[in-house]
Design a protein with these regions (language model features):
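A short, Lys/Arg-rich alpha-helix, primarily the initiator
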Residues: 1-29, 106-123, 130-131
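Conserved hydrophobic/aromatic packing and binding residues within compact polymer-binding modules
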Residues: 17, 31-32, 42-45
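The alpha-helix within a helix-turn-helix
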Residues: 21, 32, 61
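Key DNA-contact positions within bacterial/archaeal DNA-binding proteins
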Residues: 29, 40, 69
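Recognition helix of helix-turn-helix/homeodomain-like DNA-binding domains
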Residues: 36-52, 77-79
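Short, basic-rich loop-to-helix N-cap that marks the start of a DNA-contacting helix
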Residues: 49-63
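Short C-terminal boundary/hinge segments that cap the last helix of small helical domains
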Residues: 66-82
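Helix-turn-helix/homeodomain-like alpha-helical modules used for DNA recognition
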Residues: 78-131
Length: 131
């Protein structure tokens, strides 16, 4: 019984992130940079000393250059709700993941659609210049 519990247990979120990095031959620094996450906060996520918000998990999905399925797995391992196509913002993010947009390109799509940006206030150059 105890053996089955160990096999069924999901790894902690930071263990999952580290495993993804190892599987992909990536270093956390590159993921954090591509995700447009502040460096020290990103390292705290990878160490497990900070817990991510749903938006931070989505940023990490873009950092990993994840497809929709991989992004859903990240959300699941973080204990967050999945992307839901009937929610306009989630549908836009799903579209961007499916089409391999970067985080900056995705922020521009969300901005153009007048939807909340991923991560709250981090606006891309294009978004900044359109103010």
């Amino acid at each position: 019984m105890e053996k089955n519990e160990d096999e069924m247990r999901l790894p902690s979120f930071n263990e999952y992130l580290s495993g993804l990095c190892a599987d992909r031959g990536e270093v956390p620094e590159r993921i954090i940079k591509r995700a447009n996450i502040e460096r020290s906060f990103g390292h705290q996520l990878f160490k497990g000393t900070k817990n991510p918000s749903r938006d931070t998990v989505l940023q990490l999905a873009f950092g990993f250059e994840a497809d929709v399925d991989a992004a859903q797995e990240l959300l699941k391992h973080a204990g967050m709700s999945a992307l839901y196509p009937r929610v306009k913002r989630d549908a836009a993010i799903t579209y961007c993941l499916h089409n391999r947009f970067t985080i900056v390109e995705t922020q521009n799509v969300l901005h153009d659609m007048k939807l909340p940006l991923i991560g709250g206030g981090k606006r891309s150059e294009r978004c900044e210049s359109s103010r």
